[in-house]
Amino acid sequence: MSEDTRNSRKVIQGRVVSDKMDKTIVVIVETYKNHPVYGKRVRYSKKFKAHDEKNEAKTGDIVKIMETRPLSATKRFRLIEVVQKAVII
């Protein structure tokens, strides 16, 4: 596989909502779209399971994930980096 193919994969930024599984995190990604008739911005969200090899991401962190080959029945992404750590109050 060439380096160009690896870099053309989707990179998504989202927030970790679950880190309860071993080496797996659940990331929620929110997007906004305008309603076709009324023009109001509507928020859509989707959850992705991502592979976290070192278990470094925690709940509430902002992370970047990249598309990869299927790692399990539901995992299609892997963790690239933790952009921002969660603030614990």
UniProtKB/Swiss-Prot annotation:
Top-level lineage group: Bacteria
Biological process per Gene Ontology, one example term: translation
GO MF terms held by the record: rRNA binding; structural constituent of ribosome
Organism for this UniProt entry: Lactiplantibacillus plantarum (strain ATCC BAA-793 / NCIMB 8826 / WCFS1)
Subunit structure: Part of the 30S ribosomal subunit.
UniProt keywords, alphabetically: Ribonucleoprotein, Ribosomal protein, RNA-binding, rRNA-binding
Protein name listed in UniProt: Small ribosomal subunit protein uS17
Function: One of the primary rRNA binding proteins, it binds specifically to the 5'-end of 16S ribosomal RNA.
Keyword Ribonucleoprotein: yes
Any matching Pfam family: Ribosomal_S17
Gene3D superfamilies: Nucleic acid-binding proteins
Entry-linked InterPro entries: NA-bd_OB-fold (IPR012340), Ribosomal_uS17 (IPR000266), Ribosomal_uS17_bact/chlr (IPR019984), Ribosomal_uS17_CS (IPR019979)
GO cellular component: cytosolic small ribosomal subunit
Family stated for the protein in its record: Belongs to the universal ribosomal protein uS17 family.
